[in-house]
Amino acid sequence: PYVAPASTSYSAIPNRYHLAYTESVARHGSRGLSSYKYDALLTLMAQSAAENNYAGFVSPEVGKEFINNVNAITAANVGNGYGMLSGQGAIQHQGIGERIYQRDADLFANAAKQGLRVSYQSSGEPRATESGENFKLGFDQASNGLLANAVVAPNNPADNNSGKDFDKNTTTLYFHKTDNPDGTQKTGEAKERAERYQQFVANDEGLAEAEENVTNDPSMTTASHNLLSQIFTDDFLASIGKEEGQRIWYNTADGTKKGAANCAAGADPAKDANACGDAKKKIASEQDAAMDLYNLYIIAADMEQENTGSHTFNFDQYFQGQHAQDAKTFAWSLDAEDFYEKGPSYAGQDETY
């Protein structure tokens, strides 16, 4: 998780200069799972492993604990809202807002005297707006409301509630997709730019080759089997694959390719559309399953406040000892994907810029 900097790490304003303007650009804070996906697929896989008295697990006890962990993190995300800021994420942005004021208090005092205003913007993604709301909360509390009402009126408010002070700016802050978070579509130059980037991610041969090299790296195969072997039997793991007679789980209610929609237990899809899974997602290899488990492990670190009571989970146990190296391998894989898709990427391309 994000570690707040100490005041001693702030850089000083150069001699003979004075601060006239400041801007803070931030990604959303710690969040829960973006959708019912990793937990959904591992639930389906675990249901198969639990057949015949947990025959697919190394022991019934290990199987029951694994299932409880997955069910618990699902319940925590249903309670918090899939894709929404976690309690930890809210605290992070409150702290950023507080430190912005503390660092530049003189600037804001002068702004208040001159009748200047603060401009707030959001990509329109709910967790981004929620992050901004918490930033403003921290800023306003630290400044005793000095500029709480001195806000530039947004042309397109992010929402009608706490996000009413945030101007929804998808062109700048959500430029990578043609579909905006609210379901509208980009037009004109913004749409063309998003389409070029999406085409790059989907069809660029250089990008595909680079990512294939990462996927096929022997370290990924080894780490995936090592991780899963703590939980599942070798025979069960050998049954996963695309060959005839092997198993694939799709993110549907029964795990089949054309099964019904798969929604998290206890969720209300009318209020949380992300609580229902994308049927195209699947587990078709050990690596798929291992990466899903790793993704639960890393999101758990962002959900410490939600990891309590009836939905207490522990994914750290699967990445202890020699398996800490497995975690490093999976982290390398995700970092490589971001490097190639989001930049700098490979030499000679310019879409990520």
Predicted region positions:
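Signature for phosphate-centric chemistry
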Residues: 1-117, 123-353
